[in-house]
From Swiss-Prot:
Its main location: nucleus. Belongs to the FLO/LFY family. GO terms for cellular component: nucleus. GO terms for biological process: regulation of DNA-templated transcription. The keyword Nucleus applies. Signal peptide: none annotated. It comes from Populus trichocarpa. The record marks K253, N260, R264, G311 as: Interaction with DNA. This is Floricaula/leafy homolog. Keywords: Activator, Developmental protein, DNA-binding, Nucleus, Transcription, Transcription regulation.
Length: 377
């Protein structure tokens, strides 16, 4: 026997035995693995409103998703006590092995308390609005329609730092769709072509402009009279009293003047036609009405007879006020603070500047020639 042939056959590889059958190939290929189910596959619309409740308090989106998965809703959390909230958070940690951040524990309680305060404030406002609608007055009955909602300076609460990016990434698409639908619904046509804003199409209905009316006269058509304008200041005073009573009950700082807090309260109470720009714009006209009603009525009649617009009447209201200040030592702030209905309003900057300029003019002219200067209107 040839030894070389023996060694050749010993080390000869049978490659055919190593090739598996095609059917075996198919059996050996593992089936495609399904992607693991997302641990937090709760979409924003399935969070039962928890995303709006928690988003500004630094609570992670996945934490809210786990709370919703346990079956909790906003109404359920609002009706729970602090001890029950602690039990809920402990259950969340034990069942899902989910580590809650310290800030999240405080944030959940803070969000629930803030929502309770908001709901508590809205209930008396609605009741007061319903009761206030029954009171009749002789103001512009035909001009109470079509009020606008103008911007009021609001102090936006800073959102918490934890988990905000996750919230935005998950819920941004849903919010865009909802905001787009709301904007489409809010677009209305401005029916008053000669309004102060002049836009043909806007996102909110504009309030009908004011016209100069005599005392007791009711404006007709799409206009508001001056009696109605002065009535808005009385409403602001009522809203300030309500804000003060709420602040006293809570032990918070009590405002003494009409501030942004009062305008926000009026807006939430449904009186969106009361806003800071408009009320500050005509506050000196209301001051003349309070300090010298006869002079205010005479000025209204004169401008009504001449057919002047409300802008010219507004400018003319400065001069009688400066004359009143000249008779009381030019201290316009003391004049406002001494009057019960004006003490809650800030003195307009232009009125203070006019009093200051006229005082300097009167002082300089009296020292030189003894004659008074003219008001720079």
């Amino acid at each position: 026997m040839d030894p070389e042939a023996f060694t050749a056959s010993l080390f000869k590889w049978d490659t055919r035995a190593m090739v598996p059958h095609p059917n075996r190939l198919l059996e050996m290929v593992p089936p495609p693995q399904q992607p693991p189910a997302a641990a937090f596959a709760v979409r924003p619309r399935e969070l039962c409103g928890l995303e709006e409740l928690f988003q500004a308090y630094g609570i992670r989106y996945y934490t809210a998703a786990k709370i919703a998965e346990l079956g909790f809703t906003v109404n359920t959390l609002l009706d729970m006590k602090d001890e029950e909230l602690d039990e809920m958070m402990n259950s969340l940690s034990q069942i899902f092995r989910w580590d809650l951040l310290v800030g999240e524990r405080y944030g959940i309680k803070a969000a629930v308390r803030a929502e309770r305060r908001r709901l508590d404030e809205e209930d008396p406002r609605r009741r007061q609005l319903l009761s206030g609608d029954n009171n009749t007055n002789t103001l512009d009955a035909l001009s109470q329609e079509g009020f606008s909602e103008e911007p009021v300076q609001q102090d936006k609460e800073a959102a918490g730092s934890g988990g905000r990016g996750t919230w935005e990434a998950v819920a941004a698409g849903e919010r865009k769709k909802q905001s787009g639908r709301k904007k489409g619904q809010r677009k209305v046509v401005d029916l008053d072509g000669d309004g102060e804003h002049g836009g043909a199409i806007c996102e909110r209905q504009r309030e009908h402009p004011f016209i100069v009316t005599e005392p007791g006269e009711v404006a007709r058509g799409k206009k508001n009279g001056l009696d109605y304008l002065f009535h808005l200041y009385e409403q602001c005073r009522d809203f300030l009293i309500q804000v003060q009573s709420i602040a006293k009950e809570r032990g918070e700082k009590c405002p003494t003047k009409v501030t942004n807090q009062v305008f926000r309260y009026a807006k939430k109470a449904g009186a969106s036609y009361i806003n800071k720009p408009k009320m500050r714009h005509y506050v000196h006209c209301y001051a003349l009405h309070c300090l010298d009603e006869d002079a205010s009525n005479a000025l209204r009649r004169a401008f009504k007879e001449r057919g002047e617009n409300v802008g010219a009447w507004r400018q003319a209201c400065y001069k009688p006020l400066v004359a009143i200040a000249s008779r009381q030592g030019w201290d316009i702030d003391s004049i406002f603070n001494a009057h019960p209905r004006l003490a809650i309003w800030y003195v307009p900057t232009k009125l203070r500047q006019l009093c200051y300029a006229e005082r300097n003019s009167a002082t300089s002219s009296s020292s030189v020639s003894g004659t008074g200067g003219h008001l720079p209107f």
